[in-house]
Amino acid sequence: MRLLARLRARSDAAYDNTYHHKLRGRLWDALQDSPYEQHHDANRPVGFSYSNPFPPRDMAEGDQRTLLVAAPQEDLLASVAEDFIADRELNIGEMPFHIDELTSLSPDVGEPGTTGTIESGTGLLVRIPPWQADAYNIDTDSDEATFWRPKHSMEPLKAQLENNLDQKHELFCPEYLPGPSATEYELFTDYELIKTFAIPVEVSQGQELTYVLSKWRFGYTVRDDDHRRHLNLALDTGLGERNALGLGFINLTNHGE
């Protein structure tokens, strides 16, 4: 499920590529006094993910932008919508917006047999744990996780994406339903790397880390109802890590064939 917000710039502003922490703060403010507030500092996926305010370029007063917020929990999105309606000023750092319109969306990859494409809306964070480095012939002396790069091959990326989505499936889907790792097929049929890049991300107040991210175009064919659920869950929660910082947000760009 998704909440689409139509935004209008309240003044001229330069686009702020370090929006992640600031936008996350507004979303957490919206979840105060809700059942989700307890997960603010929890070491687990919260469930929500979000796009950047797009298109990402400098703006003049009155220019339009769009923001998408996604989550598997309808009541979480309802809390965000209530907050956006009560306070239509949305200040993302030095980018001041007015929320003109809110719309709910329910994207769906389609019934079994449907083919389509899912594309990264924001950079995807995939890290390989140090205890798995040898299995993928990664030479490292560090105790820290290794950021995935193309030189590491597709195998660790696929494994980490599946493991991460497994965790989200356990949190947000009924326990009797099989998760992604319980199937005999991969999430996607095609993995087209668009680019890799490094950006500084403010992960908490005053703490900035540099993340190596990647953007992808994934092709899929829906195998069965379980696979449909897994792909739709990824649309709701995002792929990879740190989705609550706006990383790993994905969009359907072509489906229904």
Predicted regions and their residues:
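RNA-interacting cores
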Residues: M1-E257
